[in-house]
């Protein structure tokens, strides 16, 4: 056997070893629900998008019930710019007026959602695109953001327009889909009882869905490896109390704070464990679920 044949044999042996070692994890998650929040750089990279779709297809084929929730901030900003719609910001947060929320719904529940559905379907599965309006799945209320002025230390409440937070989740439709061959792909748009449409932060939306489904795992695909310590080293596992302390001592800071707070709330609402992982790593979902070392920061109660 020459060097080329040896090399090919080694590759096949490694693939076989991975499949063999993955079996206990596949059995662990069989018939369980895994919610995956898809966002960040991975959404803008065609190769990563195809790898993600293949991961989701493999989960379904392994007897797992995946539910995908996606964001789309950069794509919304791009369409607003093309349409000549100027955004107004309060403390760095976009104010979503009536015209903008129409664009948000068009982009999130329309083009982005259907692109993800098509990617998963191309892998031989049946994905279906939905948002909070479908089947009265999610109802939202207007969200208010409280900020403290750094100079005066006066607390101020920001009105961000048609930005909402989920207050009711009906799992009926998702349970029906879990019993079928369908994979739900959810856009974070929902109605209010007031008849208005609200744009919801995708992380918060995913947390609410995972909590309502009492998911085995909630995975957040991000642009970072996970939660890092002050030396930049990945923290492999955290409890809620440990995460709270890391927020207090500012080890966890900036945009990671609301993400970790969403993780903690999901755990309190019945999710078994939450993982923050790097969506820029191809097949990170499989690495997290089907290997001993995982692929990010595991947060548990």
UniProtKB/Swiss-Prot annotation:
<dbReference type="GO" id="GO:0005524">
    <property type="term" value="F:ATP binding"/>
</dbReference>
<keyword id="KW-0055">Arginine biosynthesis</keyword>
<keyword id="KW-0963">Cytoplasm</keyword>
<keyword id="KW-0028">Amino-acid biosynthesis</keyword>
<dbReference type="GO" id="GO:0006526">
    <property type="term" value="P:L-arginine biosynthetic process"/>
</dbReference>
<dbReference type="InterPro" id="IPR041727">
    <property type="entry name" value="NAGK-C"/>
</dbReference>
<keyword id="KW-0418">Kinase</keyword>
<comment type="pathway">
    <text>Amino-acid biosynthesis; L-arginine biosynthesis; N(2)-acetyl-L-ornithine from L-glutamate: step 2/4.</text>
</comment>
<comment type="similarity">
    <text>Belongs to the acetylglutamate kinase family. ArgB subfamily.</text>
</comment>
<dbReference type="InterPro" id="IPR001057">
    <property type="entry name" value="Glu/AcGlu_kinase"/>
</dbReference>
<feature type="binding site">
    <location>
        <position position="199"/>
    </location>
    <ligand>
        <name>substrate</name>
    </ligand>
</feature>
<dbReference type="GO" id="GO:0042450">
    <property type="term" value="P:arginine biosynthetic process via ornithine"/>
</dbReference>
<dbReference type="Pfam" id="PF00696">
    <property type="entry name" value="AA_kinase"/>
</dbReference>
<feature type="binding site">
    <location>
        <begin position="72"/>
        <end position="73"/>
    </location>
    <ligand>
        <name>substrate</name>
    </ligand>
</feature>
<keyword id="KW-0067">ATP-binding</keyword>
<feature type="binding site">
    <location>
        <position position="94"/>
    </location>
    <ligand>
        <name>substrate</name>
    </ligand>
</feature>
<dbReference type="InterPro" id="IPR004662">
    <property type="entry name" value="AcgluKinase_fam"/>
</dbReference>
<comment type="function">
    <text>Catalyzes the ATP-dependent phosphorylation of N-acetyl-L-glutamate.</text>
</comment>
<keyword id="KW-0547">Nucleotide-binding</keyword>
<dbReference type="GO" id="GO:0005737">
    <property type="term" value="C:cytoplasm"/>
</dbReference>
<feature type="site" description="Transition state stabilizer">
    <location>
        <position position="37"/>
    </location>
</feature>
<keyword id="KW-0808">Transferase</keyword>
<dbReference type="InterPro" id="IPR037528">
    <property type="entry name" value="ArgB"/>
</dbReference>
<dbReference type="InterPro" id="IPR001048">
    <property type="entry name" value="Asp/Glu/Uridylate_kinase"/>
</dbReference>
<protein>
    <recommendedName>
        <fullName>Acetylglutamate kinase</fullName>
        <ecNumber>2.7.2.8</ecNumber>
    </recommendedName>
</protein>
<feature type="site" description="Transition state stabilizer">
    <location>
        <position position="259"/>
    </location>
</feature>
<dbReference type="InterPro" id="IPR036393">
    <property type="entry name" value="AceGlu_kinase-like_sf"/>
</dbReference>
<dbReference type="GO" id="GO:0003991">
    <property type="term" value="F:acetylglutamate kinase activity"/>
</dbReference>
């Amino acid at each position: 056997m020459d060097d080329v044949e040896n090399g090919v044999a080694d590759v096949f042996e490694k693939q076989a070893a991975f499949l063999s070692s993955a079996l206990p994890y596949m059995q662990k998650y069989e018939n369980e629900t895994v919610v995956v929040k898809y966002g960040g750089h991975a959404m803008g990279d065609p190769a990563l998008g195809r790898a993600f779709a293949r991961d989701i297809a493999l989960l379904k084929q392994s007897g797992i019930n995946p539910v995908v929730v996606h964001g789309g901030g950069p794509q919304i900003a791009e369409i607003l710019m093309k349409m000549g719609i100027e955004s107004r910001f309060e403390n760095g947060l976009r104010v979503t007026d009536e015209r903008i929320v129409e664009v948000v719904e068009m982009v999130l529940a329309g083009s982005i959602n259907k692109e993800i559905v098509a990617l998963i379907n191309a892998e031989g599965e049946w994905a279906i695109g939905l948002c909070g309006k479908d089947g009265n799945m999610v109802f939202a209320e207007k969200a208010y953001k409280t900020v403290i002025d750094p100079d005066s230390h006066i607390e101020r409440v920001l009105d961000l327009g048609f930005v909402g937070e989920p207050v009711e989740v009906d799992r009926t439709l998702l349970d029906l889909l879990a019993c079928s061959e369908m994979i739900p792909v959810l856009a974070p748009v929902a109605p209010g009882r007031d008849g208005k449409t609200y744009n919801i932060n995708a992380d918060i939306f995913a947390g609410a869905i995972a909590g309502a489904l009492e998911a085995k795992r909630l995975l957040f695909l991000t642009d970072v490896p996970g939660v890092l310590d002050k030396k930049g080293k990945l923290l492999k596992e955290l409890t809620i109390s440990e995460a709270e302390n890391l927020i207090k001592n500012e080890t966890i800071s900036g945009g990671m704070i609301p993400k970790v707070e969403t993780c903690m709330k999901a755990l309190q609402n019945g999710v078994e464990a939450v993982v923050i992982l790097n969506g820029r790593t191809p097949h990170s979902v499989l690495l997290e679920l089907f290997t001993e070392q995982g692929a990010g920061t595991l947060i548990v109660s």
